[in-house]
């Protein structure tokens, strides 16, 4: 009887150890998920802030076209240069957001595996 009790205790201890490892793995995945979401949210807010700043610059420039002398060749070129620069800034913001999306998606895919894999 004592062998059977000892065997049962060993099985229970193994199961407890397995559950503890699973708990630790999920807790670590939770921490990493929280970090990923927080950094993605912060990056999104910064991207929106940058796009809003560009929009504000454009909104200020359009009504001031008379003062910018866009009816002259030099003024038109300068305004065109300004618009191209703003377009490049927008492209840079979108490209950075796209790259962040790819990076965070890879992390989330890896985390999904941590949530679904049994601990060893």
Swiss-Prot record:
One Pfam family name is DUF4226
Which top-level group of life is the source organism from? Bacteria
Name the InterPro entries for this protein. Answer: DUF4226
Family membership: To M.tuberculosis Rv0026 and Rv0739.
Put simply, this protein is called: Uncharacterized protein MT0028
């Amino acid at each position: 009887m004592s062998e059977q009790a000892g065997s049962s205790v060993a099985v229970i201890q193994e199961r407890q150890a397995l559950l503890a490892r699973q708990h630790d793995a999920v807790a670590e995945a939770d921490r990493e998920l929280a970090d990923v979401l927080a950094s993605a949210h912060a990056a999104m807010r910064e991207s929106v802030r940058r796009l809003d700043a560009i929009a504000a610059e454009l909104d200020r420039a359009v009504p001031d076209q008379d003062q910018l002398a866009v009816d002259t060749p030099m003024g038109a070129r300068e305004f065109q240069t300004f618009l191209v620069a703003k377009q490049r800034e927008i492209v840079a913001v979108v490209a950075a957001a796209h790259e962040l999306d790819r990076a965070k998606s890879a992390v989330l895919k890896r985390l999904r595996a941590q949530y679904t894999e049994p601990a060893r």
